[in-house]
Amino acid sequence: MSVKWEKQEGNEGVLTVEVDADTFNKALDDAFKKVVKQVSIPGFRKGKVPRGLFEQRFGVEALYQDALDILLPVEYPKAVEEAGIEPVDRPEIDVEKIEKGENLIFTAKVTVKPEVKLGEYKGLGIEKDDTAVTDEDVQNELKSLQERQAELVVKEDGKVEEGDTVVLDFEGFVDGEAFEGGKAENYSLEVGSGSFIPGFEDQLVGLEAGAEKDVEVTFPEEYHAEELAGKPAVFKVKIHEIKAKELPELDDEFAKDVDEEVGTLAELTEKTKKRLEEAKENEADAKLREELVLKAAENAEADIPQAMIDTELDRMMKEFEQRLQMQGMNLELYFQFSGQDENALKEQMKEDAEKRVKSNLTLEAIAKAENLQVTDEEVEEELSKMAEAYNMPVENIKQAIGSTDGMKEDLKVRKAIDFLVENR
């Protein structure tokens, strides 16, 4: 095999590959073995037609496409490795010369990973956020725990207040006409939760059980149902029941109820403080790392191919869909409720996709510039962590992953981020 790489404008280039005749003839042999199984010629059983008769009847050219299908997936990656390039998209293959007994010549128009010109990435002067936890932070967290343990108790007397839960019937009208999805009976709504259209919940405050009221609101301009967006509406409301939150006492019994590992409120308070400190530390670390990466990427220069952005957008869409599925939703439902379509969502994600791609390219360039290497021991350590996380033997993890090349690249990028933190 001979390989020639010609760089063209931007990140494009042409790879010219010449495959020796013996290799091409072997591919023709394999192609014939595949094709002949489907060929019937009078006097011969299917699959038993002699090669010479096949070529006489159909021509050797009938085998060329199958031979290419066998050959290209093997020879193209070899050529890429020999040329030392990193394609980021499927190649455009053009066969220049194909003839039995001769060398095969094909070209591949390729988009490659861009070169990155690093700017400042050391001494970026970004500081880590303060991670101190105050007594107020701890008390607020305990109050949140208290709120989550609250019971709803029916108010026999009194009016609706912020934070109360009301059980109500409602029916909405636009231009005097009821609309689909605008009616419910015995619906439980926490007043002040922001669950309903802006202005709806505020108008319930002060009402008593049994009260009826016309609640006037205007649907937001960006409301998911286009036929309602921006329109004024009237909801006929009837309050059946008002429930107030009854908070448990903050005492030792409360502490034991929310955490069986503690015996007193003092122990719960101390444990809560440590948990908040750990959370703040992790949050500050993550923010610092993100800001350093973004700044280093901002200082770098790279002509990013659209193919890389498109690939990242597809990855982000899959991640988004997985998050929706965890919430019991899918893309179709999301588009229905949001009023968006796939193109609009991708356009919304585009800037983040570009930042992700440039950040990753920058980190790879930093790893190369600083000669950051990943050892076999570090790979084994990472595999062990994965095995522990998934509760599987390390060998099973290795089989599932196959090649560890991708893992090595990920670890190298992680080392580049560590380098930015240490040299900020």
From Swiss-Prot:
First-listed, main subcellular location of the protein, grouped into a coarse class: cytoplasm
Domain of life: Bacteria
Annotated GO CC locations: cytoplasm
Comment block on domains: Consists of 3 domains; the N-terminus binds the ribosome, the middle domain has PPIase activity, while the C-terminus has intrinsic chaperone activity on its own.
Annotated compartments: Cytoplasm
Name of this protein: Trigger factor
One GO molecular-function entry: peptidyl-prolyl cis-trans isomerase activity
